[in-house]
């Protein structure tokens, strides 16, 4: 399946976990450029880097990216996507994939898979992917776990391992780890801004819980490729440098 979709790469400058990380040098290029180059292989009809910082915007323009400046007002990611869609003039039926600006090792095929997943499930309001991880990985609060029904629609997402093992009837050895790349129709992004807030979102700091709280449907498929290391903190930079070829 190769239908039209757009990509928005969010590159917010002063993130609490790692300020200025979009501009982190990886083999002579800012990290955001490596992310952009991964996105180009996905078959998307348009790629937009959304940032609240002129330094990031100028760097992105220098390597040929389309840039959309967003407001520096602490919006959540989904609301920022809606702001970009409004500024780009995209219609409600346009499919948009959000691609994190700190995921330079993500294969292009993953981006296309999540866009295809939304098109394959027209009753879904959002589509995403997951990978199976060990209990050791699932124990980390930085990884978001999810559970699905028998049609792979998301029932809940959490920073603690779910399902929690109590009964001996079934031994939980692996967990579904949420890959934070989603596909939406632009119309849903615009609706999201006006949905009632969710205390579940506030408690877990997972904005997709606001969708579930308001009766929206999220379909999750297992990723068809391994997902590389993300740059969550400064310590991750050297790990990523080892995995990215110097001439890339």
Task: Tell me what each language-model feature is.
Residues 1-19:
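N-terminal nucleotide-binding beta1-loop-alpha1 segment
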Residues 173-248:
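Conserved alpha/beta core of the MobA/IspD/sugar-nucleotide pyrophosphorylase nucleotidyltransferase superfamily
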Residues 31-46, 58-63, 213-214:
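A short, N-terminal amphipathic alpha-helix
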Residues 13, 52-54:
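Residues in the short beta-alpha loop(s) of Rossmann-like NAD(P)-binding domains
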Residues 13, 71-77, 225-227:
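Short, acidic/turn-prone active-site loops that include or flank metal/cofactor-
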Residues 48, 55-116:
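Short phosphate-binding loop-to-helix
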Residues 108-196:
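Conserved core of the sugar-phosphate nucleotidyltransferase
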Residues 4-9, 32, 46-47:
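Hydrophobic targeting segments
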């Amino acid at each position: 399946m190769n239908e039209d979709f757009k990509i928005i790469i969010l590159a917010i400058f002063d993130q609490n976990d790692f300020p200025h990380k979009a501009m982190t040098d990886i083999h002579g290029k800012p990290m955001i450029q490596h992310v952009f180059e991964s996105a180009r292989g996905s078959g998307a009809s348009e790629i937009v880097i959304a940032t609240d910082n002129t330094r990031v915007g100028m760097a992105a323009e220098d390597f040929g990216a389309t840039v959309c400046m967003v407001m520096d007002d602490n919006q959540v990611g989904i609301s920022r996507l809606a702001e970009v869609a409004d500024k780009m003039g995209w219609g409600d039926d346009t499919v948009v994939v959000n691609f994190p600006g700190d995921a330079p090792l993500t294969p292009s095929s993953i981006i296309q898979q999540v866009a295809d997943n939304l098109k394959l499930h027209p009753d879904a309001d959002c589509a995403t992917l997951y990978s199976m991880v060990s209990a050791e990985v699932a124990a980390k609060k930085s990884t978001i776990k999810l559970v699905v029904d028998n049609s792979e629609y998301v029932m809940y997402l959490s920073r603690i391992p779910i399902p929690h093992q109590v009964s001996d009837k079934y031994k939980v050895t692996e967990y579904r780890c949420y890959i934070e790349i989603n596909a939406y129709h632009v119309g849903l992004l615009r609706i999201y801004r006006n949905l009632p807030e969710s205390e579940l979102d506030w408690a877990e700091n997972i904005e997709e819980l606001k969708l579930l709280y308001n009766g929206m449907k999220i379909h999750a498929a297992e990723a068809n490729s391994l997902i590389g290391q993300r740059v969550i903190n400064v310590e991750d930079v050297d790990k990523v440098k080892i995995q990215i070829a110097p001439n890339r």
